[in-house]
């Protein structure tokens, strides 16, 4: 493994445990501990533990911080409170998604933005440049934080045993600061990237190995990036760099709920997003399920039954839950019809698929 790759505080723990390490977004990360299927199914039926310390953390603070945060982000940041986080997008002037992220308000005019690992430097530079017009400071604090995710139907009961607050009623994106977890001070967020109940835990970077070891003493399955990807795909959750990019808008990506272009406040990309909200976007993201044998992979072309290309695959895998090959595709809006049969070009073969819901695990 190259010494140039960044490493989380848990890297040595993973090497010692025999986890398979791969490069991801410039980081040396575990792709699996046992098998992807085993880890995936543990999260769907019981619970799994992920190291997500590679994610970036950026602080925005100052007397004008709230105005800067709203100017940068596509959602209505007035709805962000010291107990309620928000999923949102960092957009360019064309409405394209520079990154998708979560915003936490730590106190008045102090915000924590959690961004994708491979985009941290790019995001920071973009925010730093835009902040020059505001009385606000942008600080990259990524090295100070560790982040763990406990996910699965049994996650809440486990977390409750070791925290000093009641988590039984915590709803998605609610969070609490200064929570004691295995004796360490953490931010506890009811969030995740699997489609299951669970929590993301922000801790001091130095505390991450201790917390990892303590959690694993409770019959929790350690999980790698492989299961994280299959889990998020079953749930229809997008990945930046594949399903989201600087040339794809929130309306095209299926995350319109993260864009609020009708609010009074201005933000970058607002005019384009307002037009797409009022008039529709030319493309949309759909779920696909393969009818014939073959796994849809990123970049594979999608055609209608008349042979016209209507889009391409952005993500795909074989679902460990159902055994079916599934994917997400960005297609022309006028080609969309739920249940419609399409053709995916899998190498030299044309393979039939059908349009389905993106979230394939929703009850």
Curated annotation (Swiss-Prot):
Organism superkingdom: Bacteria
GO BP: any one term: glycine decarboxylation via glycine cleavage system
Enzyme class: transferase
Keyword Transferase: yes
Disulphide-bonded residues: none
GO cellular component terms given for this protein: cytosol; glycine cleavage complex
The reaction(s) this protein catalyses: N(6)-[(R)-S(8)-aminomethyldihydrolipoyl]-L-lysyl-[protein] + (6S)-5,6,7,8-tetrahydrofolate = N(6)-[(R)-dihydrolipoyl]-L-lysyl-[protein] + (6R)-5,10-methylene-5,6,7,8-tetrahydrofolate + NH4(+)
Subunit structure: The glycine cleavage system is composed of four proteins: P, T, L and H.
Function: The glycine cleavage system catalyzes the degradation of glycine.
Name of the featured protein: Aminomethyltransferase
Lineage: Bacteria, Bacillati, Bacillota, Bacilli, Bacillales
């Amino acid at each position: 493994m190259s010494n140039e790759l960044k490493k989380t505080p848990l890297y040595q723990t993973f090497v010692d445990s025999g986890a398979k390490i791969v490069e991801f977004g410039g980081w040396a990360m575990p792709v699996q501990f046992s098998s992807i299927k085993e880890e995936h199914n543990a999260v769907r039926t019981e619970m799994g533990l992920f190291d997500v310390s590679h994610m970036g953390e950026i602080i925005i603070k100052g007397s004008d911080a709230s105005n800067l945060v709203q100017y940068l982000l596509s959602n209505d940041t007035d709805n962000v409170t010291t107990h309620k986080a928000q999923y949102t997008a960092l957009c360019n002037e064309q409405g394209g998604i520079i990154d998708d992220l979560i915003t936490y308000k730590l106190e008045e005019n102090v915000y924590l933005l959690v961004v994708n690992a491979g985009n941290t430097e790019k995001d920071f530079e973009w925010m730093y440049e835009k902040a020059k017009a505001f009385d606000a400071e942008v600080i990259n604090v990524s090295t100070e934080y560790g982040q763990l995710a406990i996910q699965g139907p049994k996650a809440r009961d486990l977390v409750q045993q070791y925290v000093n607050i009641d988590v039984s009623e915590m709803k998605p994106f609610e969070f609490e600061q200064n929570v004691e977890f295995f004796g360490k001070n953490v931010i506890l967020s009811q969030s995740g990237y699997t489609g299951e109940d669970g929590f993301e835990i922000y801790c001091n970077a130095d505390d991450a190995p201790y917390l990892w070891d303590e959690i694993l003493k409770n019959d929790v399955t350690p999980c790698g990036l492989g299961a994280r990807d299959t889990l998020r795909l079953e749930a229809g959750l997008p990945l930046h760099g594949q399903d989201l990019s600087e040339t794809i808008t929130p309306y095209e990506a299926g995350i319109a709920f993260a864009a609020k272009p009708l609010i009074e406040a201005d933000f970058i990309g607002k005019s384009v997003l307002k037009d797409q909200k009022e008039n529709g976007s030319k493309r949309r993201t759909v779920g696909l399920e393969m009818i014939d044998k073959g796994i849809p992979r990123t970049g594979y072309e999608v055609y209608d039954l008349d042979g016209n290309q209507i889009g391409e695959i952005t993500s795909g895998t074989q679902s460990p839950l159902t055994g079916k090959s599934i994917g997400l595709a960005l297609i022309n809006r006028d080609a969309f019809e739920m249940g419609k049969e399409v053709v995916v070009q899998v190498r030299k073969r044309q393979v039939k698929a059908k349009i389905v819901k993106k979230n394939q695990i929703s009850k």
